[in-house]
């Protein structure tokens, strides 16, 4: 296990468009690992959308770099999110090199001996092949916006597994087993009521620990 992963584990402790509801929040650290050439615009849109989704679930997302963990913060919940590949679509013509297969994975979270680990990965090549054809005619800034928002929804799904410590899914919303293209690109896509109740209870349980 690398030094920065060990450092991130040391941060964990047991101490105490349409608007989304504002709730008391439990701090959730999301450490993002991306290629050096990652375009910042889709990433910023992803952060904005992800913060809103998790806020409604009772979590306040704090972003960081896994190579420079904040050892003084003492976050209650922590996720390392790796962005694999080129996460975005540059301005200009878009050519679909290979169609995405039905049921292809957009992301995954590590599981060890049945235990959900706080390490998730987004497969941006598969995401691009999924939504790229619908964004081909959009201007560069709009592509960044829609792409970043789609990334956030995929990330929120994986973070659900990490925060709940479970591989289970809901029947609807962000925590359901698979997404449609509409889920990724529609104006609004959130956790359903059942998933929200579970997440809010989890956040409250963490916040109440002595």
Language-model-detected regions and their locations in the chain:
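Generic ordered-secondary-structure signal
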Residues: 2-3, 8-9, 55-62, 82-88, ...
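Disordered inhibitory propeptide/activation segment of secreted metzincin zinc metalloprotease zymogens
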Residues: 1-29, 57, 97-116
